[in-house]
Amino acid sequence: MSDTTAPAFDFQDREPFWQNEWKRRNTFAVPDVPPADRPKYYVLEMFPYPSGQLHVGHVRNYTLGDVVARYKRARGFAVMHPMGWDAFGLPAENAARERNVHPGKWTMDNIATMRGTLQRLGFSLDWDREIATCLPEYYGKQQKLFTDMLGAGLVERRDSLVNWDPVDETVLANEQVVDGRGWRSGALIEKKKLSQWFLKITKFAQPLLDDLKTLDRWPERVRTMQERWIGRSEGARVRFALHQPPAGYDEDLDSVEVFTTRPDTLFGLSFIGISAEHPLARKVAESNPQAAAFIEECRRLGTSEEVIEAAEKRGFDTGLRVANPLDPEKTAPVWIANFVLMDYGTGAVFGCPCGDQRDLDFARKYDLPVPQVLLPPGQDAETFVLGKKAVSGDATLFNSGFLDGLDPAAARTKVIERLEGLGAGKGVVNWRLRDWGISRQRYWGCPIPIIHCDTCGPVPVPDEQLPVILPEDVTFDRPGNPLDHHPTWKHVNCPHCGKPAVRETDTFDTFVDSSWYFARFTSPHAETPTVPAAANGWLPVDQYIGGIEHAILHLLYARFFTRAMHETGHLDVDEPFAGLFTQGMVTHESYRDDSGWLYPEEVERQGDQVVRRETGTPVQVGRSEKMSKSKRNTVSPVDIIERYGADTARWFVLSDSPPERDMEWTAAGVAAAARFGQRLHRLVASVAARDAADSAHGATGDDLRRVTHRTIAAVGEALEAFTPNVAVARLHELTSALADAERIEGAGIAAARREAARVLCLLTAPMMPHLAEDMMAVLEPGSALVVERPWPEAEEKWLAVQSVTIGVQILGKLRGTIEVPPNAPKEEVLAAAKSEPNVARLLEGKRLVKEIHVPNRIVNFVVAG
């Protein structure tokens, strides 16, 4: 039987067949406690929000994880590979309002749809471990974690300034404030103090920073981002007393406290900048309408660091002045500045234009003094004049009294000593990291298990009363949190004194839900949040996979939660993820015509032109970019599965480019992947029909065996290195070698072909598992499933390099090549080179002047005459 006439792979029939076989055998289940007879390996992809439809970015993410899981299983590991749903969140509430459907029903319907798609893709998931964060079985255990953290001093309640949407009656994150208005309601946002619950992540700031060094299987980029977010800064906290404060400025308002990393430049003080939310700014605004207007302008800018950084730097002179603690005779003005953040440091900065470009630009814009206190190397103190750029890098202090002549490091030490002696400051470590505010005025979230009693204060709900279950009989016909308007759920008796009390109606930030799910997967049906033997046996996650967009918040919160769970006795590990891989996005061209954006299936290529299918009219082709519903450049995984099969989708997302890079989704690429799968199936079927299973090896098959075993080694190395695209390339090469061997006759080639076909079944299994099972069933009927077989081992004798190709030059020009054993003696190489027919012809009659031999690389003959 030839390659072209062998039966095709009927994916519509065979993919469901093999999925049912795996399910029937419970192939991917593992016990809660890892087995003692083999090493464990925990593979986890960031679980999805159940929006209703998987997109091809999901397909890439989960395929990468599945390749790792299947490969490690074949390598003899006990592999846990679970799946769940990050199921709370605002989109469900929006759907409830827009579609008149309960968030719970909307969410669970979406989960059912997406689960079905994942199962059609053939992922090796242990579905018995499935969790959904919106179910009481999950969030009730989360409430227990919260009360335990409260008891351990890791939770506190305090007033916090928030972005309040007066129409939606809810708190908005900084990113949800656009031009001073709520992103959904459009209402002008108010700054409001609310009592909020905080998790004290700052308690772990130092270990969270230090232990980044241990995460050597994390991308350097992610570790750097976390390091900057945690933001450890050594410096000084300096108190600047108000110079001649006006009446009414009591002792809480008679000074400005500033954190600075450059106390050595205090003699360069030009101005003090305070946040629009600083108490001093609010005090000034009470009697100054212009100040109040400027503060309102700052509020409209929002509080997003990115927006503030990009905005024009503006300020308002309060008329107040402060004294320099190192030289009280010198004073400087206090400005409200739109670039000062209240939640970093003290909400105030001291401006030293000489050493900071932003301060220099601000000072020159408002014609403020620019004291020169930093002298660059090679400059003369008598003649140096600061130009348009602030001084950076090495410098010496001058015009700075007792600091003159010192370098900045030595000057910092002396300044801090002087400030502490004066009672005007002290050396401190400041953190950019802030405690995590977890209160959200939302219904569709985990209820915070607190009861507020006028007598007892906030009381944690006792363990025996957990979970606090969300009521289902709520309505969304008015603004605000439906829990506030549900009297039978809200009003309860105090667990301590029995008096009337009310439940906390805020729910957890949904980042809480995703901060410990990896631990719950280890014992998802337990009555406690974790089972120590299970959690400590499986954790940390060996390979975590997800997008770079989660590099900071989710990953940092998960690291914090792991430490908090350790401190409260739920875990014995400190880091949740030993290995992290951040995959790139899937992109697609965009298409549009006069009617607007078009879906990819609405266009087709005709020669060099792209036209609309139904009209044949040309369309405009945009660049390949992130898929988005607005530009309709999306592709449905379901459509791909139905047209080409799951294995085609899996193969394509692995083969195009390194997984950390963005990849372009193309119809041509998918079609090529489908053709390869069919070619491979026909090839293996042809070998099965042609070559007897008991064929003996012989010399005729040596070349193919060499390719086969080198492919085994190369694919294993590629999967260990997380470069599946390289594995795909090597499998293409082995497939081509096997196809070429179909034309060879002789003793030994049949056995080599069967070996190559069998190896192709085993090596393609992590990527195209259905096809691999089907090919093996054709090649070895009635034998074990591929998923139950070990990974093949490469035989060393076939890995050794048999020969090297050496170029032969005459006067530097390549005239031929020879094959010789590696590291062959020079005399042997030169003799072979002179015997090469073309070289021998060209050397005839010439005088050899010099013979140059570079071992294993090249021979060059220098001739004359």
Curated annotation (Swiss-Prot):
Pfam families noted in UniProt: Anticodon_1 (PF08264), tRNA-synt_1 (PF00133), tRNA-synt_1_2 (PF13603), tRNA-synt_1g (PF09334)
MF (Gene Ontology): aminoacyl-tRNA deacylase activity; ATP binding; leucine-tRNA ligase activity
Keywords: Aminoacyl-tRNA synthetase, ATP-binding, Cytoplasm, Ligase, Nucleotide-binding, Protein biosynthesis
GO cellular component, one term: cytosol
Ranges spanned by the short sequence motif 'KMSKS' region, renumbered to the chain: 626-630
HAMAP family the UniProt entry points to: Leu_tRNA_synth_B
GO biological process: leucyl-tRNA aminoacylation
Subcellular location: Cytoplasm
Domain of life: Bacteria
Keyword Secreted in record: no
The protein's Enzyme Commission number: 6.1.1.4
Signal peptide: none
Binding locations of ATP: 629
Location of the motif 'HIGH' region: 48-58
Protein name in UniProt: Leucine--tRNA ligase
SUPFAM superfamilies, sorted: Anticodon-binding domain of a subclass of class I aminoacyl-tRNA synthetases, Nucleotidylyl transferase, ValRS/IleRS/LeuRS editing domain
Reaction catalysed by this enzyme: tRNA(Leu) + L-leucine + ATP = L-leucyl-tRNA(Leu) + AMP + diphosphate
Lineage: Bacteria, Pseudomonadati, Pseudomonadota, Alphaproteobacteria, Acetobacterales
Family: Belongs to the class-I aminoacyl-tRNA synthetase family.
